[in-house]
Amino acid sequence: MWVCLQLPVFLASVTLFEVAASDTIAQAASTTTISDAVSKVKIQVNKAFLDSRTRLKTTLSSEAPTTQQLSEYFKHAKGRTRTAIRNGQVWEESLKRLRRDTTLTNVTDPSLDLTALSWEVGCGAPVPLVKCDENSPYRTITGDCNNRRSPALGAANRALARWLPAEYEDGLALPFGWTQRKTRNGFRVPLAREVSNKIVGYLDEEGVLDQNRSLLFMQWGQIVDHDLDFAPETELGSNEHSKTQCEEYCIQGDNCFPIMFPKNDPKLKTQGKCMPFFRAGFVCPTPPYQSLAREQINAVTSFLDASLVYGSEPSLASRLRNLSSPLGLMAVNQEAWDHGLAYLPFNNKKPSPCEFINTTARVPCFLAGDFRASEQILLATAHTLLLREHNRLARELKKLNPHWNGEKLYQEARKILGAFIQIITFRDYLPIVLGSEMQKWIPPYQGYNNSVDPRISNVFTFAFRFGHMEVPSTVSRLDENYQPWGPEAELPLHTLFFNTWRIIKDGGIDPLVRGLLAKKSKLMNQDKMVTSELRNKLFQPTHKIHGFDLAAINLQRCRDHGMPGYNSWRGFCGLSQPKTLKGLQTVLKNKILAKKLMDLYKTPDNIDIWIGGNAEPMVERGRVGPLLACLLGRQFQQIRDGDRFWWENPGVFTEKQRDSLQKVSFSRLICDNTHITKVPLHAFQANNYPHDFVDCSTVDKLDLSPWASREN
């Protein structure tokens, strides 16, 4: 059984500003040398960041953006995140320059004053020192101040946590597969696309649906994931390797790590030699600099706090609010309405990739607390429901408490919606993900523990991608009788990326919500892993552009992040570590799959965690195997126990409020925020209409009377 990590060393040093004075005697790189190197690098990196922003605006205005450029719109770092990533880039490039231009033999040479370098780069700049109000009953938007001993713990724009040390080809930053002749554990790593082609792909969509899980089960997983983590791509740091060279000519270098197509790949005929791939944004190392290996950023808060609704940066949080109203409302769309109900506001910053999808309709992307909200139509639908629920709560609270001002109403509604997401996730979602392993990894709540590290781990960002196996090839829209809606009731998934016009001008969200309730998720199958809609047509909303391969991207991203291999994580979780084909067959209970993996990777040690974890047979009553159950369960337990504002923690809500909150349900959310009147009681389970559906009048409502107060 895993025991909570104690953090005395980490808590003493996690904040970017708590830098220890250097005790070096001889400094090969003097302060002047460091300053000169950093100044030169800043000019180079700043230009690269500016060029990238300019290029993105130009290409999206061209009426013919590429798949990469559409993707980049959502992966583009903004605000404080952009500053943090830029500083990380300057740090790394400065180290390279100092190593090249001075007598240093390696970048961890004790004679290099890393403290001086940190300050010269400006590594403290992205996150100004926060003055915490210890008596505030509300979370900060940034996630700071949750842990009183270490206020930055779990905050946005910090490094993802490492549960095992990073494994890079050069020990610092280069991913395995970067240098052709270099090996990992004695073997060359296979091309990511080759693994996707031989292991992940399938042709026949028959029999792939999950007879026990609704499509909403898949969609809730993406909502939770976007609440917890986001690692935007970085920019290219040198002038030698422009994005054009990476995207059009597959020239590897700097932060360009193209996904090369293997021989006989059908994409060779239409897409050239590769899919472009840009490495994830990373941050400066933190004192005491025990490791200088590249650490990827988490741009959002690590807490399950509805940050995807409210944002993780103060400037965005403010932009999302209706500050002209004293009701504590979120801003809504002023140009279009869903039969009297609100839509998300448009992100009116031009250009918008969503307008390119249908140049006649010209509907922009939506604006939400997470920039990925318009990535696909069901995600935008779920965001819309959460936005409406905030405003419903705020209005109801105003009726109960006419004396509350807009700020109080906003914060209380935000607090309740955060609790809603926590309850739905832990009560309804995780038990049918982890199945028989639920109690092992997430025992009953014992209260807040300030020694538990709530940060999202790097490996979790891959473990949680099991949801990609649950995405079906089509999305259905249903009418009030749960029958096909209109002439285009069933749409291919790839036509719904960046597709906001289908919501605004073609039926609203109700037909899509009914599809989420009455249609099924895809079932992960060892020989039918990821639909071709994601494996060949990702971000291909029109026939004018080519699609990406999400599976290959996941595998390449494992290497980009320096992920240890399959057996390292099996050992971490106390599971057996197969060394041979026979051993792998025993673990996977599948001789054919084990042989395919061994033919590609040569050793189980090298299998990328994303494919290795997903290849395992599912645990009883769950939808992941033993390894992913361990990684997911451990992470969610830490998210819960390391959160001072967790809804069950005494003092966060009153006892009566907690009793009331236990009655929330996703079905009630739908009843309260759509025109739908028939819903299933168990929204994540597969449901057949009308047998499994009830009238909204029979679904418990959230009783807000415990929130009535005489206090302001």
Swiss-Prot record:
Pfam families: An_peroxidase. The record marks R372 as: Transition state stabilizer. Its EC number is 1.11.1.7. Mammary gland; milk. Disulfide bonds join C123-C284, C132-C145, C246-C256, C250-C274, C354-C365, C573-C630, C671-C696. It catalyses: 2 a phenolic donor + H2O2 = 2 a phenolic radical donor + 2 H2O; thiocyanate + H2O2 + H(+) = hypothiocyanous acid + H2O; iodide + H2O2 = hypoiodite + H2O. Its main location: secreted. The modification Phosphoserine is found at S315. GO terms for biological process: antibacterial humoral response; defense response to bacterium; detection of chemical stimulus involved in sensory perception of bitter taste; hydrogen peroxide catabolic process; response to oxidative stress. GO terms for cellular component: basolateral plasma membrane; cytoplasm; extracellular space. The keyword tRNA-binding does not apply. Residues 1-22 form the signal peptide. Its cofactor is Ca(2+); heme b. The active site is at H226 (proton acceptor). GO terms for molecular function: calcium ion binding; heme binding; lactoperoxidase activity; peroxidase activity; thiocyanate peroxidase activity. The keyword Cytoplasm applies. It is an enzyme of class 1 (oxidoreductase). Residues 23-100 form a propeptide. Belongs to the peroxidase family. XPO subfamily. Heme-containing oxidoreductase which catalyzes the conversion of thiocyanate (SCN(-)) into antimicrobial agent hypothiocyanous acid (OSCN(-)) in the presence of hydrogen peroxide (H2O2). Also involved in the conversion of iodide (I(-)) into hypoiodite (IO(-)) in the presence of H2O2. Responsible for the inactivation of a wide range of micro-organisms and hence, important component of defense mechanism. The lactoperoxidase-SCN(-)-H2O2 system shows antibacterial properties against some streptococci strains. The lactoperoxidase-I(-)-H2O2 system shows antibacterial properties against E.coli. This is Lactoperoxidase. It comes from Bos taurus (Bovine). The gene is LPO.
